């Protein structure tokens, strides 16, 4: 028998029967015979033959392929230690940053990334003791460091809601607030705008999404909130015109594709 008993993105509790048959069980589930059950309160995530449950609360648990934002907390001889908001240690080795041959005896790695720098990386591997290996190769902005802007942190399980279907929610926020935004699957979000008031508005919108992520009609509420706040800013002379959702730059297109690829 091959059957899935739940819908994708359905809220489930521990012990919920998710599927039966030749499916693979991912995080937040366990398998008993041919049946897969949930072990946490969370949202069902079905990808191909793999079924997992994304917890509604709790720390970020990384998976290989995740794109994350992180903060450099230590610089070593040939690597950096990175805080990604996980219970486990994350490391970026020099060979996972560049293919260039580096003379480590003569080179201080702080010339590339220093303590406190924010980087954008991909989870390359996780070993048997949960040490996390990162890579910045092929990442937008070459991994960073990301200059200016602000970092906000939300529960990682709320990231899909912030991104929206096909990147719809985050792209709406980016366009209306004219902000550059990078969303990490660990729940860390980098926001930067030339206008401090618009940057503040983007942050307000994202935090509202986190608070109301379980509710219906959220996209319309966020849109209406943004347009209302933008009208106030226009009346105060902070902005000249309310940005159009139809406008799109080449850079936004690149970022939209990147955001869409990160959606779970």
Curated annotation (Swiss-Prot):
Gene Ontology annotations for the cellular component aspect, listed alphabetically: cytoplasm; exosome (RNase complex)
Gene3D superfamilies: 2.40.50.100, K Homology domain, type 1 (3.30.1370.10), Nucleic acid-binding proteins (2.40.50.140)
Compositionally biased tracts (Acidic residues): 244-258
Predominant location: cytoplasm
Keywords attached to this entry: Cytoplasm, Exosome, RNA-binding
UniProt record, GO biological process: CUT catabolic process; exonucleolytic trimming to generate mature 3'-end of 5.8S rRNA from tricistronic rRNA transcript (SSU-rRNA, 5.8S rRNA, LSU-rRNA); poly(A)-dependent snoRNA 3'-end processing; RNA catabolic process; U4 snRNA 3'-end processing
UniProt subcellular location: Cytoplasm
Domain named KH: residues: 147-206
Domain S1 motif, chain residue ranges per copy: 65-137
Region (Disordered): 244-264
Gene Ontology MF annotations: poly(A) binding
Family: Belongs to the RRP4 family.
NCBIfam families with a match to the protein in the record: PRK04163.1-1
PANTHER family in UniProt: EXOSOME COMPLEX COMPONENT RRP4, PNAS-3 RELATED
Assembly and binders: Component of the archaeal exosome complex. Forms a trimer of Rrp4 and/or Csl4 subunits. The trimer associates with a hexameric ring-like arrangement composed of 3 Rrp41-Rrp42 heterodimers.
Protein name as annotated: Exosome complex component Rrp4
Protein species of origin: Pyrococcus furiosus (strain ATCC 43587 / DSM 3638 / JCM 8422 / Vc1)
């Amino acid at each position: 028998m091959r059957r899935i008993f739940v819908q994708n993105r359905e809220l489930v509790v521990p012990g919920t029967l998710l599927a039966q048959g030749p499916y693979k069980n991912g995080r937040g589930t366990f398998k008993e015979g041919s049946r897969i059950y949930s072990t946490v309160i969370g949202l069902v995530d079905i990808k191909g033959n793999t079924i997992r449950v994304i917890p509604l609360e709790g720390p970020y648990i990384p998976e290989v392929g995740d794109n994350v934002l992180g903060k450099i907390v230590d610089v070593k001889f040939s690597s950096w230690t990175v805080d990604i908001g996980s219970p486990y240690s994350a490391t970026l080795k020099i060979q996972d940053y560049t293919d260039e041959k580096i003379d480590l005896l003569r080179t201080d790695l702080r010339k590339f990334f220093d303590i406190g720098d924010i980087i954008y990386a991909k989870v390359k591997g996780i070993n048997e003791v949960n040490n996390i290996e990162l890579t910045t190769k092929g990442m937008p902005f070459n991994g960073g460091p990301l200059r200016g802007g602000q970092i906000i942190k939300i529960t990682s399980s709320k990231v899909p809601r912030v991104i929206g279907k096909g990147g719809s929610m985050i792209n709406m926020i980016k366009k209306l607030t004219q902000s550059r935004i990078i969303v990490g699957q660990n729940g860390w979000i980098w926001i930067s705008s030339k206008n401090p008031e618009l940057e503040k508005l983007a942050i307000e919108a994202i935090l509202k999404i986190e608070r109301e992520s379980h509710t219906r009609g959220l996209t319309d509420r966020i849109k209406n909130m943004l347009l209302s706040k933008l009208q106030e800013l226009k009346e105060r002379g902070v902005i000249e015109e309310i940005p159009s959702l139809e406008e799109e730059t080449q850079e936004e297109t690149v970022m939209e594709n990147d955001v869409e690829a990160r959606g779970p």
